[in-house]
Every structure is written in structure tokens, then in C-alpha cells.
Regions:
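Hydrophobic pocket/interface hotspot
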Residues: 11, 23-24, 31, 44, ...
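Short, low-complexity N-terminal intrinsically disordered segments enriched in polar/charged residues
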Residues: 1-29, 120
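Hydrophobic/aromatic beta-strand elements that line small-molecule binding cavities or substrate pockets
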Residues: 52, 64-70, 81-82, 94-100
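A solvent-exposed, acidic/Ser-Thr-rich amphipathic alpha-helical stretch
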Residues: 20-73
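Short beta-strand edge/turn micro-motifs at domain boundaries
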Residues: 94-120
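Short beta-strand segments that buttress and anchor functional surface loops
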Residues: 78-86
Length: 122
């Protein structure tokens, strides 16, 4: 397995710890994180950390289950199900993620998904 693919596997696994410092350490200082159905993009490590803190804070559990992952040089893409517990609700969200890697860190992350399951929370 390539280092870039392993980096993303480790990043995905880190989410289950809900440890924001561990998760944010995977990013470059100038990284960009975009949840495609949401605005705006999170630009820079500080903005990404703020978003992740808010997300992790509202979740009682987080698990990302990767079904398929492909690698093309510095690009890693995966199809996964994000299993998230928020209050009494459990969400299983199908996601397509694209990661760009630079110098052993994530420099760009784009997730594509349907907001429907979150809208159902009320």
C-alpha cells in the first residue's frame, strides 16, 4: 500500500477517536476542506480546525467505513459510509471523498454527499 493511501486510512481511523488535535495534524497549513453541498469552503488549517471542533462537538460517535479506495499519485479517492450519532439520531451517510496529498499531509479534501439525512434531523 502506498504512503498516500495509508495516510488517508490513518486519517479516516482518527475520526473515531473524536480527537480534534489528532485529526487536524493530518492537514497542511494552507489546506482547503470543502463539503460540496455546504458553503463556504474551509480555507487554512485554523478554519478547518474550527469546523471539525464544531462537528465533533455535536457527535457522540463517528465512524467512517471505506468501501473502495483508489490512488493516483498524490490523489486518493474513497467511497465510504460515514456513520454519525447526533443526540438520539444515527445517520449513515454515503460519501465520495477526494484527497490531495502534499509532503505527507492533506492539502485539499472534498466530500460529496446528499444533505438529506441532516435535514431530517430537524
Amino acid at each position: 500500500m502506498s504512503d498516500n493511501s495509508q495516510l488517508i486510512n490513518d486519517f479516516i481511523a482518527a475520526w473515531s477517536t473524536r480527537d480534534v488535535e489528532q485529526i487536524i495534524d493530518f492537514f497542511t497549513e494552507d489546506a482547503v476542506y470543502i463539503n460540496i453541498p455546504m458553503e463556504p469552503a474551509n480555507e487554512g488549517k485554523a478554519a478547518i480546525q474550527s469546523f471539525i471542533e464544531g462537528f465533533v462537538g455535536m457527535c457522540s460517535s463517528i465512524e467512517f467505513v471505506v468501501h473502495h479506495q483508489v490512488l493516483a499519485g498524490n490523489l486518493v479517492m474513497n467511497e465510504r459510509t460515514d456513520k454519525i450519532s447526533i443526540g438520539d439520531s444515527n445517520i449513515e451517510l454515503p460519501v465520495m471523498g477526494t484527497f490531495e496529498i502534499r509532503d505527507g499531509k492533506i492539502s485539499a479534501w472534498r466530500d460529496y454527499f446528499d444533505m438529506g439525512p441532516f435535514k431530517d434531523l430537524g
